[in-house]
Amino acid sequence: MDSRREVEESSTAPILESKRTRSNGKGKSIDGDHSPPHAATVVTTKATPLQKGGMKKGIAILDFILRLGAIGAALGAAVIMGTNEQILPFFTQFLQFHAQWDDFPMFKFFVVANGAAAGFLILSLPFSIVCIVRPLAAGPRFLLVIVDLVLMALVVAAASSAAAVVYLAHNGSQDANWNAICQQFTDFCQGSSLAVVASFVASVFLACLVVVSSVALKRT
């Protein structure tokens, strides 16, 4: 009887060991199944800086395009106003009817302000290109925000003062006994109005530049 029990125990021992090895193999396969999610999380964490840099590069390209638009509008406003004059075909022995932009101090300030804004915007183009090449750099973008804010204030002030003169030229002022001159100097008034509109367009471009650069700085 003892020999039979020893034979049965010896025969069942390999079966138990095989079951244990199978269970261990299943455990290893379960651990192996958990490894791909860890690898996926590592890939996602590495991809986030690339997505962030791509977004900033797109913002930098938009900044460059808006900067070109602001240069065109400000330079156009300065050129139109700086070449604006009209001489009426009739004159008397002592008087000639002539209207020119430098007869008004506000128009002089307008030409200087828009010309300076166009010049500084041209000088800022290399910094905008640096932001495209290095989208994560915060120093050049912070400098552009400061310059754009100053230029926006300058252009808005110049456009507002010139708009007041253009309004008086079109409508006059009964209280001050100022007559409207745009009925006689039609071309001069049209040129002045077009320059003022271009200057306000430049100020809108500059405002968009400030917003775009501020958003890019906030995401750094």
From Swiss-Prot:
Coiled-coil residue windows: none
A GO CC term assigned to this protein in UniProt: plasma membrane
Source organism, top-level taxon: Eukaryota
Transmembrane segments: 61-81, 109-129, 142-162, 195-215
Extracellular side: 82-108, 163-194
Main location: membrane
Pfam family, one: CASP_dom
Subunit-structure text: Homodimer and heterodimers.
Name of the featured protein: Casparian strip membrane protein 4
Naturally occurring in which organism (per UniProt): Medicago truncatula
